[in-house]
A protein has these predicted regions:
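Accessory beta-strand-rich segments of carbohydrate-active enzymes
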Residues: 10-125, 148-149, 169, 220-222
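Beta-strand-rich binding/interaction modules
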Residues: 47-49, 138-177, 183-187, 208
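Exposed aromatic-hydrophobic patches
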Residues: 63-70, 183-193
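Extracellular Ig-like/FN3 beta-sandwich strand-entry sites
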Residues: 74-76, 153-155, 182, 201-205
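Short, aromatic- and glycine-rich surface loops/edge beta-strands on solvent-exposed regions
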Residues: 78-81, 202-214
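Surface beta-strand/loop "capping" patches
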Residues: 119-150
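Short, exposed coil/turn segments at beta-strand boundaries within extracellular/luminal domains
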Residues: 168, 214-217
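Conserved small/polar residues in nucleotide/adenosyl-binding loops
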Residues: 225-226
């Protein structure tokens, strides 16, 4: 046996497909919920529910999410995940990327970190993008909702506060009306004249929260360069 001391070593090396399967139970109160399979970190995957293919994902450095809503009803189901650290990863990445090389983390196989089935309301905040505008101390906020039906009359609230600065600042919250049939929105949210600016010596950050009252909320961090 050859001993290796210049990088990580393993008892066994494997490249190819690995299969993981287990029975899951969906509770009755998840009926009509939006259900997502969340895999925090893995290799290229294919997912099946009860033998029906849900989809594929090849993310290596970010979480993978699969929408299982139309595959799961309350009751028993079989979840199967195929993870492939072989030819599903391009050869150049396998041979030279820090995500795969023996001198860093190796070309491991499997699923690590959080592995969850997440159930949420059919209406939720799918994404939020924030673009600080230094000139008028505002933030352009782009929001995408999960769907556009059943939202008429509901409101979305934006709020923001500095959280890592000696000088505290909390912007005045603002409410916006949601329109039936619209799932994408763009707002200009004012932080106020006393908003704290980001610099390399004082990297002031804000937590910007978007909330649909009693339904869902999402928070992102932003900074406004001086």
């Amino acid at each position: 046996n050859k001993s290796e001391t210049t990088y990580l070593s393993r008892y066994y090396k494997y490249e190819g497909a690995a299969w993981y399967s287990r029975n899951i139970e969906i509770p009755a109160d998840w009926k009509e919920k939006h259900i997502v399979l969340f895999l925090e970190r893995t290799r290229p995957t294919t997912v099946w529910i009860d033998g029906r293919e849900v989809g594929k994902c090849n993310y290596l450095s970010t979480p993978q999410e699969f929408n299982l809503t139309h595959f799961l009803a309350p009751g028993s189901h079989k979840l199967t995940i195929r993870v492939d650290n072989g030819k599903s990863i391009p050869g150049q990445i396998r041979s030279s990327s820090h995500a795969c090389t023996e001198s860093t983390q190796t070309n491991w196989n499997g699923i690590i970190g959080r592995m969850e089935l997440q159930a949420m309301n059919p209406l939720f905040i799918e994404s939020i993008q924030a673009f600080p505008q230094v000139e008028d101390r505002s933030v352009k906020v782009k929001i995408t909702l999960s769907n556009s039906s059943g939202i008429g009359g509901k409101k979305l609230q934006l709020s923001a506060s500095a959280f890592n600065t000696a000088k505290k600042h909390k912007a005045r919250s603002a409410e916006y009306n949601l329109k039936e049939g619209s799932k994408e929105y763009e707002f200009t949210y004012q932080l106020g004249d006393n908003a704290v600016l980001w610099s390399d010596l004082q990297p002031a950050l804000y937590q910007l929260k978007a909330e649909i009252n009693g339904i869902d909320e999402k928070t992102v961090q932003i900074g406004r360069a001086s």
